[in-house]
């Protein structure tokens, strides 16, 4: 059934160059988009927003670590290795399950959703689209994306639930950053001589 759903989704590719280009763009640049979004929130947000960015980034990294650990005990070949699949773009023949792109995107998104729904929901939708694009281009099975969603939800929940353990580190990083920025942007005082 996993392969049948994969064929149904991937079978939509190679018919419309505009849709293919959109899916390739998403699959190749989603992680860059997430990095830029988090950077913008960090640079233009307030203290609380910066803390949210750190929690989201740490959660994303933790999700990728979990993915790596999964690949040490379970290896699923990619669809284009196990079957005749014409991918839209090339990819290494490494482990298919779970999808790193999708896990990273959704772990960041879910972490942000727990802290700021207004920003979190669009990120979750984009994360799901990222997972869909991975199937569309022929790099992952649907179960790979579903596995990524499960990893992201579990990691996102755990890191939110136990965020007090990270709070001293997060607070310290934000305080140091804001102290540096305040020092750099402080206007010199006029002195009468």
From Swiss-Prot:
GO terms for biological process: cell wall organization; peptidoglycan biosynthetic process; regulation of cell shape; response to antibiotic. Induction: Expression is sigma M, sigma X and sigma I-dependent. Induced by vancomycin and bacitracin, via sigma M. Expression is maximal during early exponential phase and decreases during stationary phase. It is an enzyme of class 3 (hydrolase). Its EC number is 3.6.1.27. The chain crosses the membrane at residues 24-44, 53-73, 119-139, 140-160. It catalyses: di-trans,octa-cis-undecaprenyl diphosphate + H2O = di-trans,octa-cis-undecaprenyl phosphate + phosphate + H(+). One of its GO terms (molecular function) is undecaprenyl-diphosphatase activity. Keywords: Antibiotic resistance, Cell membrane, Cell shape, Cell wall biogenesis/degradation, Hydrolase, Membrane, Peptidoglycan synthesis, Transmembrane, Transmembrane helix. It is found in: Cell membrane. One of its GO terms (cellular component) is plasma membrane. Gene3D superfamilies: Phosphatidic acid phosphatase type 2/haloperoxidase. It comes from the Bacteria. It is a multi-pass membrane protein. Disruption phenotype: Disruption results in a marked decrease of resistance to bacitracin. Belongs to the BcrC/YbjG family. Bacitracin is thought to be involved in the inhibition of peptidoglycan synthesis by sequestering undecaprenyl diphosphate, thereby reducing the pool of lipid carrier available. Catalyzes the dephosphorylation of undecaprenyl diphosphate (UPP). Confers resistance to bacitracin. This is Undecaprenyl-diphosphatase BcrC. It comes from Bacillus subtilis (strain 168). The gene is bcrC.
């Amino acid at each position: 059934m996993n392969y049948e759903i994969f064929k149904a989704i991937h079978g939509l590719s190679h018919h419309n160059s505009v849709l293919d280009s959109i899916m390739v763009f998403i699959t190749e640049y989603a992680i860059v988009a997430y990095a830029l979004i988090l950077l913008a929130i960090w640079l233009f947000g307030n203290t609380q927003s910066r803390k949210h960015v750190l929690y989201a980034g740490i959660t994303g990294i933790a999700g990728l670590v979990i993915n790596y650990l999964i690949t040490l005990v379970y290896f699923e070949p990619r669809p284009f290795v196990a079957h005749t699949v014409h991918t839209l773009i090339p990819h290494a023949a490494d482990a298919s399950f779970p999808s790193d792109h999708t896990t990273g995107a959704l772990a960041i998104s879910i972490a942000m959703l727990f802290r700021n729904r207004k920003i979190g929901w669009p990120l979750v939708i984009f994360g799901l689209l990222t997972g869909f694009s991975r199937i569309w281009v022929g790099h992952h099975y649907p179960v790979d994306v579903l596995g990524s969603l499960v990893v992201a939800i579990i990691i996102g929940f755990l890191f939110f639930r136990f965020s007090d353990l990270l709070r001293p580190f997060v607070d310290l990083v934000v305080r140091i950053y804001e102290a540096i920025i305040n020092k750099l942007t402080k206007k010199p005082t006029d002195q009468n001589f």
